[in-house]
Every structure is written in structure tokens, then in C-alpha cells.
Amino acid sequence: VEYINRLIGALAGLACVIALFFSFGYRKENKKLIFLSFLICLLMGFQAWLGKTVVDSVLNPYKITTHMLAALLIVAVQLFVIYSVQEKLKTTAFNAEFKWAVVAALGLTIAQIIFGTQVRESVDTIVESGLPKEVWLQNPKGGFYMHRSFSIVVLFTNLFLFWRNRELKLGFKRINWIMGLLCLEILSGITMYYFNFPFGS
């Protein structure tokens, strides 16, 4: 798994360097594209170094969290780059309430990722203690309940977005994909808790 992870990371880094090269073709129309492409390359380098420190630290939870957040930042910048080079065809309506709800949903999702990493940290501590798997989550810490309960907050926030998008006919079609993936994510968490947590252990 580690080899595959490094191989994919190397290919992704190469793709970013190629994208930086082609970004110079937009230097007259969109100069910030060069800066953003260069920023992505820097972030990819930082991510590669951070990935090494994660492995060297034997999967330190705090470094894993930073590693994941850095990955999300890279994806966010890449999506912005894709948006900036596309033709600006207005296919959606604007609604201030919806905009701030999206910001709230993003913040809640990042918080949920951090809570999930803390849960994993507590489980790793219990696993290292040598206790049988059956008792790993018999008396979980408060972070576990926070992570579980917070998923409901994230779900209802995105349900609100889904409902407002339909009611106001804003035209954001990707909200359907978000809802599907979110439900799948929650289902996977429930499955891990009630059947075999963590998988492969």
C-alpha cells in the first residue's frame, strides 16, 4: 500500500509540473494561473515531505491530520485553477444564504475530519495496549461521541443545501453527488463500528 501511495504521489507531482509548464501559455490572459500552478507544485513538495514524516513517525495522528488537510488544500487550489481557465458560462443563480451555508458546511466537514483522526488516535492507543478487539470501543472517549454526533450536524447542513438548491432552483447539480458520497461515508462509519473496526485488523 505504501509503495502504491508513493507511486501515485510521484505521478501526481509530475502532472502538476506539466500543468505548470502549460500554464505559461496563459501568461497574457491569466497571469495568476502561473502563480497558482507554482503554488500547487510547492504544496505537492510539502505534501511529499509530510508524507515521509508521517511514515517515519509511525502514523502520528497529528501529522496524519495535517497530511489530510494539506491534501484538501491542494485539491481546492486545483479546482480553482480548473474553474479559472474555463469559460465563464453562468449556469447557476446566486443566493447569499446558500453561499454562507456552503462555507459553514465546508468548515464543519474539516472539523469532522479532525475529530475522525482523533478517534483513530484513541483506537491506536488501545490497540497498542494489547486489549482484545471486542473491547476496543466498549468505553470510548468523548472524541468518539463527538465524531459520531457531529456527522449528524454535517448531514443536516448538507441536507439544507440540497433542499435550498432545489427550492430556489439555483442549478448546483453537484450537490446530488455530495449528498450521495456523504451518505456513503456515514454508512461506512456505521459499518466499521458495528462489524469490524478497523477493517483488516
Language-model-detected regions and their locations in the chain:
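Polytopic transmembrane helical bundles with strong interfacial aromatic enrichment
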Residues: 1-201
